[in-house]
Curated annotation (Swiss-Prot):
Keywords: Disulfide bond, Nematocyst, Secreted, Signal, Toxin. Expressed in acontia, a specialised envenomation structure laden with batteries of venom-containing nematocysts found only in the superfamily Metridioidea. It comes from the Eukaryota. This is Unknown 12C protein. Contains 6 disulfide bonds. Cysteine-rich protein with probable toxin activity. The keyword Cell membrane does not apply. Residues 1-17 form the signal peptide. It is found in: Secreted; Nematocyst.
Length: 123
């Protein structure tokens, strides 16, 4: 509840601060929102990492300068046997996720679910 309130407050501060800001130019290509985060809320990344440990890994490309100051924890890989044991029924899994994870999440599928996605591709 508290983290959601902080996130809403942070977003409203960022949006209100975007008025009047021109395009950001730097050696690292960043969006104006990223420059604003660095200038006005330099600790936002640290706070976001506390809320979501994978924040910098997930959003690094949009704000590299901000996230360089953060520790970038790696997501633990899923054990390969999990895919073999739990993901043998492609239609049921697609219904559970609401999408074809072999197409929508191809990087995950190619790393951990090769045998699972072979089943999907045959159907």
């Amino acid at each position: 509840m508290m983290s959601a309130l902080f996130l809403v407050l942070s977003v409203s501060l960022l949006v209100s601060g975007l008025q009047g800001i021109g395009e950001a130019t730097s050696e690292i290509k960043e969006s104006p929102l990223c420059s604003l985060m660095e200038e006005r809320l330099p600790d936002l990344c640290e706070v976001q990492v506390k809320i979501d440990p994978h924040y910098c890994q997930d959003h690094f490309s949009s704000c590299p300068r901000t996230c360089l100051r953060c520790k970038r924890p790696q997501k633990p890989p899923a054990p390969p046997r999990e895919c073999k044991d739990l993901r043998t029924d492609c239609p049921r899994a697609m219904h559970s996720y609401g999408m074809d994870i072999c197409r929508e999440m191809s990087s995950y599928a190619s790393m951990y679910c090769k045998s699972y996605c072979k089943l999907c591709n045959k159907r």
